[in-house]
């Protein structure tokens, strides 16, 4: 009976506890049982509150965290600053400016008087124009009395067609009553052509007539271009008055010698008498 009682197990709750042994072991077993029961109860409560109870959890690709606004702002400012900086606006001198319209070009040439004016036709996408731009700015700085007008081909393409500009970079020199002095195309490698033309036409000259500017054929072509808001009326041809016409005729007669009078021969007489203008 004693052996049977020793082998018997007393059931308390749902845990089997041997009837014999130290009390410390019994207390430890009871404590572990209580802790396991408390953990199970806590897990059950959390499971009831969780929205994923009894559902499948889909795991997708990892998403990057949004960047704070204070970090994005400097990047946007740098990009905006880079877009605003244009190569043809760098290094400009006080005597350099960009033409805004056909009327602006005509007025600028007319109001320049006897000063030398250089019209620079360029394009933002032209590599030769970009390479030549720093040297043109340097030349403009060395010649403050020369006016440099820049014409953007991309913004004034229709006007350039009317002015027969089909190659870039392209330059035209104008001065006073002489109008257009020369026109040519040059690159960074042929900058000597530009310097030679500047040295030839830079010396001051006094015009005796009004400032000419563009040719009349070019003005008519600009006026006929429907894409441009430019008006021009052909100047009437001046008819010389009577005194002016007589003076012009006298000038022509003084330069040309009149041929001598031919002798006249009387027919029907035996003697042939020569009648001259002096007899």
Swiss-Prot record:
GO cellular component terms, A-Z: chloroplast
S-S bonds: 126-129
Protein family membership: Belongs to the thioredoxin family.
Chain's role: Probable thiol-disulfide oxidoreductase that may participate in various redox reactions.
Region (Disordered): 242-279
Pfam families referenced in this protein's UniProt entry, alphabetically: Thioredoxin
Keyword Metal-binding: no
Species name: Oryza sativa subsp. japonica (Rice)
Keyword Nucleus applies: no
Cell compartment(s), UniProt: Plastid, Chloroplast
Biological-process GO terms, alphabetical: cell redox homeostasis
SUPFAM superfamilies, per the entry: Thioredoxin-like
Main location: plastid
Active site location: 126, 129
Keywords, in A-Z order: Chloroplast, Disulfide bond, Electron transport, Plastid, Redox-active center, Transit peptide, Transport
The protein's name in its UniProt record: Thioredoxin-like 1-2, chloroplastic
Transit peptide limits: 1-34
Domain of life: Eukaryota
Residue stretches making up the Thioredoxin domain: 61-203
Coiled coil residues, start to end: none
InterPro entries per the UniProt record, alphabetical: Thioredoxin-like_sf (IPR036249), Thioredoxin_domain (IPR013766)
């Amino acid at each position: 009976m004693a052996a049977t009682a020793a082998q018997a197990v007393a059931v308390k709750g749902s845990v089997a506890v041997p009837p014999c042994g130290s009390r410390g072991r019994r207390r430890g077993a009871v404590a572990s049982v209580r802790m396991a029961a408390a953990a199970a109860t806590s897990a059950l409560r959390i499971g009831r509150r969780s929205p994923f109870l009894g559902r499948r959890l889909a795991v997708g690709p990892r998403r990057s965290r949004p960047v704070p606004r204070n970090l994005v702002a400097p990047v946007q400012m740098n990009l905006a600053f880079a877009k605003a900086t244009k190569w043809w606006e760098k290094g400009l001198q006080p005597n350099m400016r960009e033409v805004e319209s056909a009327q602006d070009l005509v007025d600028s040439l007319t109001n320049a008087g006897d000063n030398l004016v250089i019209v620079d036709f360029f394009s933002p996408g032209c590599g030769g124009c970009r390479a030549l731009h720093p040297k043109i700015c340097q030349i403009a700085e060395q010649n403050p009395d020369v006016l440099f007008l820049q014409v953007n081909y991309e913004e004034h393409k229709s006007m350039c067609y009317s002015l027969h500009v089909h190659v870039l970079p392209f330059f035209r020199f104008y001065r006073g009553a002489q109008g257009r002095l020369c026109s040519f195309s040059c690159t960074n490698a042929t900058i000597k052509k530009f310097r030679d033309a500047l040295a030839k036409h830079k010396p001051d000259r006094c015009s005796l007539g009004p400032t000419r500017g563009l040719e009349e054929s070019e003005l008519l072509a600009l006026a006929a271009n429907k894409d441009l808001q430019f008006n021009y009326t052909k100047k009437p041809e001046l008819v010389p008055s009577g005194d002016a016409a007589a003076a012009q005729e006298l000038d022509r007669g003084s330069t040309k010698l009149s041929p001598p009078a031919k002798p006249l021969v009387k027919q029907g007489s035996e003697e042939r008498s020569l009648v001259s203008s002096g007899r």
